């Protein structure tokens, strides 16, 4: 079983990085309603599109997701 996307994403946090995964990780870290226990693309993508309290380039999310799948 794959680890939750949130768990993987938190390992990408780097306060001095401008990489999209690090930026998303910082935003998600501050978001208390982010779905933390799932590895489902649709659930996370829908959350980012419709419910997140922050804006993020969803084109970059697709590449971050590919990186997550290849870890």
UniProtKB/Swiss-Prot annotation:
InterPro entries: UPF0346 (IPR010673), YozE_SAM-like (IPR023089), YozE_SAM-like_sf (IPR036806). Pfam families: YozE_SAM_like. Belongs to the UPF0346 family. NCBIfam families: PRK13672.1 (NF010193). This is UPF0346 protein Sez_1447.
């Amino acid at each position: 079983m794959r680890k939750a996307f949130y768990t993987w994403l938190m390992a990408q946090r780097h306060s001095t990085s401008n990489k999209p995964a690090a930026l998303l990780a910082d935003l998600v870290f501050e978001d208390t309603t982010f779905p933390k226990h799932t590895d489902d693309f649709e659930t996370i993508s829908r959350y980012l599109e419709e419910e997140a309290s922050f804006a993020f380039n969803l084109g970059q999310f697709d590449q971050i997701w590919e990186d997550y799948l290849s870890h």
